């Protein structure tokens, strides 16, 4: 399955690939091989980047689900966070270009905060990117829990898609957007949450339980 967020880009990649294939027929053998190989690479890379496999969200109460595919690169405690007006735990997930980049809702509830912030394009694995890069901020309040998370663009990723806005009712595990071509998601929640992941662990959006409360 290909995400609707990538259909325009996929169409552009298809056109470029067709042009390259057409050129390969009139070029010398070695040049033809290079150009046709490039056409195949562009098409295959675009297809794999915008893939959007179905996910089975655990049917379990009081869980927080990973909003992103990737690798946990940071877990830390913060003394204060504006959204919570108190201490929080933070988990940062780095998404490489080979990961699925569609993001999913971590808890069911109501969206109470949304903000788009323009910024820099530091490497997404640089922890300073969470405060300095282009990003969106989303806050969700559920029945017994609230979370705050950021979609953060990276050095390559320069297009954030986020479909939720304040007042929206959202469901755990459902798609809400994506970040194109390498990026990061930071998620924050109260310190009372029991962590279920560790640094270096891989996560799957919509499936991996990162916390329980």
Swiss-Prot record:
Protein localization: Cell membrane
Chief localization: membrane
The entry's keywords: Cell membrane, Decarboxylase, Lipid biosynthesis, Lipid metabolism, Lyase, Membrane, Phospholipid biosynthesis, Phospholipid metabolism, Pyruvate, Zymogen
Protein's pathway: Phospholipid metabolism; phosphatidylethanolamine biosynthesis; phosphatidylethanolamine from CDP-diacylglycerol: step 2/2
GO biological process: phosphatidylethanolamine biosynthetic process
InterPro entries, alphabetized: PS_Dcarbxylase (IPR003817), PSD-A (IPR033175)
Catalytic center residues: 183
Record-level Gene Ontology MF annotations: phosphatidylserine decarboxylase activity
Bound cofactor: record note: Binds 1 pyruvoyl group covalently per subunit.
GO cellular component, one term: plasma membrane
Cofactor(s) the record lists: pyruvate
Topology with respect to the bilayer: Peripheral membrane protein
EC number: 4.1.1.65
Residue list for modification Pyruvic acid (Ser): 183
Residues carrying the site annotation Cleavage (non-hydrolytic): 182-183
EC class (word): lyase
PTM comment: Is synthesized initially as an inactive proenzyme. Formation of the active enzyme involves a self-maturation process in which the active site pyruvoyl group is generated from an internal serine residue via an autocatalytic post-translational modification. Two non-identical subunits are generated from the proenzyme in this reaction, and the pyruvate is formed at the N-terminus of the alpha chain, which is derived from the carboxyl end of the proenzyme.
NCBIfam families for the chain: PRK05305.1-2, PRK05305.2-2, PRK05305.2-5
Role noted for this protein: Catalyzes the formation of phosphatidylethanolamine (PtdEtn) from phosphatidylserine (PtdSer).
PANTHER family found in the cross-reference section: ARCHAETIDYLSERINE DECARBOXYLASE PROENZYME-RELATED
Sequence similarity: Belongs to the phosphatidylserine decarboxylase family. PSD-A subfamily.
Name the record gives this protein: Phosphatidylserine decarboxylase proenzyme
Lineage: Bacteria, Pseudomonadati, Chlorobiota, Chlorobiia, Chlorobiales
